[in-house]
């Protein structure tokens, strides 16, 4: 009888892949609830059934994919709830504090559950660049969002300066050789360069950030002219061209005085003075080669 009821229950799971509610089970199966509970508990122990906690505090049940059943085998109700909360966080991940607030579990219990889920490769921890590289948790096969990883310009959640300098050099050279290009041209060219060099594909946001940096460096200029864009067959009217006039350098800004927040109250005989300034002393003690004139 239990095997027959189990098969009926699984058939019902196939019919409702998003989850079975308690009411649906009672109406569809028509057996005593004690018998159904035994079947449910047995399927959960086997890793064939997942328990889902709904927002209205009711419980649903969902069949686990055959390839994942070994990973879910033996998990308890608390494990499933934390897994469900992490699943709901999608590619942005969930903080341990969020898991604690949503579940009501103690931190020690959550830490233990997270270790269990990680060891079974159901979830993974990812360092976020947004909040001091704190860990967030997401499903094991989930690709973290750009807000978490920083995109392709970051390597192991750290700014990849060497890679960025190389890409900036390619942008400058490309614009110098072409004379005038739009962002689509740069994206096409830079994606090809990036894939050949690292087998990685840069996103439009990454490339736009690189282009902006090259502009700030004074190596290229942005032209906003819809007429010029129309002549060259560009829709946006925003083009990038080589910089004709180098941006002048103000060497006063290289000195501590140029960026000093207390410059206005500094005087020879005052409490703040060049004689007492630690930063000015360090600046004067530099070698000539290290001074940027």
From Swiss-Prot:
InterPro entries: RNA_pol_Rpc34 (IPR007832), RNA_pol_Rpc34-like (IPR016049), WH-like_DNA-bd_sf (IPR036388), WH_DNA-bd_sf (IPR036390). GO terms for biological process: transcription by RNA polymerase III. GO terms for molecular function: DNA-directed RNA polymerase activity. One of its GO terms (cellular component) is RNA polymerase III complex. Component of the RNA polymerase III (Pol III) complex. It is found in: Nucleus. It comes from Dictyostelium discoideum (Social amoeba). This is DNA-directed RNA polymerase III subunit rpc6.
């Amino acid at each position: 009888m239990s095997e027959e009821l189990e098969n009926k229950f699984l058939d019902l799971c196939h019919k409702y892949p998003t989850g079975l509610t308690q009411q649906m089970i009672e109406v569809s199966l028509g057996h005593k609830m004690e018998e159904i509970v035994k079947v449910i508990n047995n399927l959960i122990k086997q890793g064939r059934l997942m328990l889902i906690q709904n927002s209205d505090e009711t419980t649903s049940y969902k069949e686990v994919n055959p390839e994942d059943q070994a990973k879910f085998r033996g998990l308890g109700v608390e494990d499933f709830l934390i897994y469900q909360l992490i699943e709901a966080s999608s590619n942005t991940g969930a903080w341990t504090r969020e898991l604690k607030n949503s579940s009501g579990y103690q931190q020690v219990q959550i830490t233990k559950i997270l270790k269990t889920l990680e060891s079974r490769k159901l979830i993974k921890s990812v360092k976020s660049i947004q909040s001091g590289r704190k860990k967030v948790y997401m499903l094991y096969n989930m690709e973290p969002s750009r807000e978490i990883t920083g995109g392709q310009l970051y390597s192991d959640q750290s700014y990849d300066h060497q890679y960025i300098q190389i890409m900036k050099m390619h942008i400058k050279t490309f614009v110098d050789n072409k004379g005038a290009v739009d962002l689509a041209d740069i994206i096409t060219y830079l994606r090809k360069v990036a894939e050949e060099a690292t087998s990685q594909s840069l996103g439009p946001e990454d490339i736009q950030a690189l282009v902006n940096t090259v502009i700030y460096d004074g190596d290229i200029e942005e032209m906003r002219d819809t007429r010029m864009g129309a002549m060259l067959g560009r829709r946006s009217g925003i083009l990038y061209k080589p910089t004709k006039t180098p941006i002048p350098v103000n060497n006063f800004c290289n000195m501590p005085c140029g960026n000093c927040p207390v410059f206005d109250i500094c005087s020879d005989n005052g409490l703040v003075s060049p004689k007492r300034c630690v930063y000015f002393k360090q600046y004067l003690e530099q070698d000539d080669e290290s001074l940027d004139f």
